């Protein structure tokens, strides 16, 4: 199953699951992100999903371009935001869209998606290229490397069954080092979730 198909199927129940399992982590992700955001910021949010994080930060920035490969996830976000925001653009695409080639952003956010990207190093280099000098990269990601629990087992099962094409089993330290290798200075790296680590990372473009 392609990742887009998987996330389209998850869209209807996604909020219920994530809000239940990651309520505190979501709140911390938003509050920690706000410490790095300014009212003048142009933000690109990768894999915005149903907009849980989008809605948490949109009132604090100039504009968000929110993108996702799942049309169903974007439909859910569109339902939540229709007619409410003039500083939000939704796009059914990914970060390698050539439309972004000549654009620069103050902040790029990738919440709870890096572990599903087999080409994560390439993605991080692309993020670096789309940020203005000194721009910020904000991320939160489950880090299941070295973890032996039901969540890690379920992620392995989904890959084995072909529901997901890839899950990265990296540790928080490995993820931070991968981000640094892409040309960033990590300013903050903190686990914000009990159980499976959900690592919030704020990194500045060098």
Task: Tell what function each PLM region has.
Residues 1-38, 138-163, 193:
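Conserved class I S-adenosyl-L-methionine
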Residues 44-97:
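Class I SAM-dependent methyltransferase SAM/SAH-binding core
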Residues 109:
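A conserved beta-strand element that flanks and buttresses the S-adenosyl-L-methionine
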Residues 112-113:
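Short catalytic micro-motifs in class I SAM-dependent methyltransferases
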Residues 121-133:
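A short glycine-rich, Lys/Arg-flanked "PGG" loop and its adjoining helix->strand segment in the class I
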Residues 166-182:
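Short alpha-helix
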Residues 182-184, 188-206:
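Core SAM-dependent methyltransferase catalytic element
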């Amino acid at each position: 199953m392609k990742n887009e198909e998987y996330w389209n199927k998850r869209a209807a129940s996604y909020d219920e699951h994530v809000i239940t399992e990651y309520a505190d982590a979501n709140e911390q992700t938003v509050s920690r992100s706000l410490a790095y955001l300014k009212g003048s910021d142009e933000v690109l949010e990768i894999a915005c999903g149903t907009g849980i994080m989008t809605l948490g930060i949109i009132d604090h920035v100039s504009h968000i371009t929110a993108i996702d490969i799942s049309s169903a996830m974007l439909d859910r976000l569109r339902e939540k935001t229709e007619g409410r925001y003039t500083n939000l653009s939704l796009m059914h695409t990914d970060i390698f869209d050539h439309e972004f080639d000549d654009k620069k952003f103050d902040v790029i956010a990738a919440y709870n998606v890096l572990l599903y990207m087999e080409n994560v190093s390439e993605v991080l280099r692309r993020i670096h290229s789309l940020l203005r000098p000194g721009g910020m990269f904000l991320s939160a990601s489950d880090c299941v490397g070295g973890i032996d629990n039901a969540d890690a087992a379920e992620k392995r099962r989904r890959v084995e069954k072909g529901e997901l094409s890839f899950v990265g089993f990296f540790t928080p330290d490995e993820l931070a080092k991968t981000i640094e290798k892409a040309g960033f200075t990590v300013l903050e790296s903190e686990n914000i979730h009990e159980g499976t680590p959900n690592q919030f990372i704020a990194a500045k473009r060098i």
